[in-house]
Amino acid sequence: NNSIFDIDFSLLINDSEIPINIEGSIPINKSDKLDLRLIGNGKFIELIDIFADEYFTFKKGEVNLRMLIKGSLNKPILNGFIVIKDSEIDFYNNIIKDINSLIIFDFDSLEIKNLEAKVEDSGDVFIRGALPFYSKNDSGESEIKMITSKFSLKTDNTDFLIDSEID
């Protein structure tokens, strides 16, 4: 079966004038090739906010997404980026602010370029490194470095204080 599903989809969230765009083709056969383009232009984070219910709320800032999705449905290959600038979120009633990062999807791995954030009335976190999407990747890179200083996350039942350097 060589059928494909052609898609050209734009989604407007709430009163937004900027859509989330998805266009390309999705094969019916899972081993055939994908060809999708996803452009978030700051609005895809609002979609995540809607689906995450009360556990995650995007408060402010800029989050932009551009993504090419190739490969197959069984093993997609992602090429693109997420840029986060001066953002703030509420995660389980913890305000995490001053979030800045560049996240690169480089075919078979994810690279985090200097993600920095602060917890309101608490410490900060810094994350950098790369992880493969699959257990084996061509680049060979698979290391994440996380440095936290008095980074506190609280929920109704827990209070985590993380002060560490993890390689």
Task: Go through the PLM ranges and name each one.
Residues 1-66, 74-166:
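Interface amphipathic segments
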